[in-house]
Amino acid sequence: MNVLEEVKKYKDYAVAMRREFHRHPELSWQETETAARIRRELDEMGIPYEEVVGTGTIATLKGKKDHPVIGLRCDIDALSIKEATELPYRSENDGVMHACGHDGHISMLLTAAKVLSDHRDELNCTVKLIFQPAEEKTNGALKMLETGRVGHLDTVVVSICTFHSGTMANIFAETAELSGTVRTFNPELRKQLPGMIERIIKSTCEAYRADYEFDYYCDIPATINDERCSEIAADSVKKILGEEGLVKYAGTPGGEDFSYFLERFPGVYAFVGCRNESKGCSYSLHHERFDLDEDALVNGAAFYVQYLLDAQEQF
């Protein structure tokens, strides 16, 4: 199978799906219509599925062999952002936007599902298509895993994202509340961070004769790819786009709850480039003007398919 050519046959479908999901975004754990639309597409393809944790969906495509079982995952939720683009398919849900590309992720996986369904006779494995809710809440993956159905870096990012204090401009505030996030790749360093942060808070408050309360909640672990799966993925990209289509880098401090899957199963998390300044697709994720180059939908769907075909021969 020439994967890229097979996926290109469905480019119009991929674009239409992406625009439909972009037009109707839903927040984490509220993806009712999104899930229903995904399930209708799976019904039309004749792919059976299970409804998981309400708005999650796990579809199963059986090949000639039961094993290995290989999962392809996408996230489906949107963000609480008021869209500021003038796109004809801009959000119709005021104050909610697919500003992180999840509309594209859904489209890519559904397109990959179509191609894989067309070529079931070439599958020597069982495929799990995982449509995960609530990635932005960072607990959707863990909730799905809890149902039972499914290198050394020292980077640390500490972000203070909110600061609330006071009620009026002419009244001194008695209290202030700050909140934020912490991200690191190093599990041992992650354990040390609460003490490191509290020491800074304590010394700062002592300098100003203030009291403090410190609450620290552990959230998602670092997303660390399996080396073997990464090698398979790299070869898959080269088959589709050539050597120039592959970009490798050490890591990024962005948060991603796919890490819960990687804690339990060997796997790989990859980015699909979608920036194209000539088309106005130049804003970063979570920006009110974010948009993606829809040509990337073909590359993403093709990667899903090619990786599946390559991985089934390696496990």
Where are these regions (language model features)?
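Acidic/histidine-rich catalytic neighborhood of metal-dependent amide-processing enzymes
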Residues: 104-156
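Divalent metal-coordination and catalytic microenvironments
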Residues: 21, 59, 72, 102, ...
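His/Asp/Glu-rich mid-to-C-terminal helical/loop segments that flank catalytic regions of hydrolases
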Residues: 199, 242-244, 273-315
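Midchain, well-structured core segments that form catalytic/ion-binding scaffolds
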Residues: 136, 142-228, 252-253, 259
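Acidic/His- and Gly-rich active-site-bordering loop/insert found
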Residues: 2-98, 107-110, 114-124
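Active-site-adjacent substrate-binding region
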Residues: 215, 219-274
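Generic non-transmembrane alpha-helical segments
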Residues: 6, 10, 16-20, 37, ...
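Short pre-catalytic strand/loop immediately N-terminal to key active-site residues, enriched for Gly-Thr
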Residues: 91-100, 247-248, 287-294
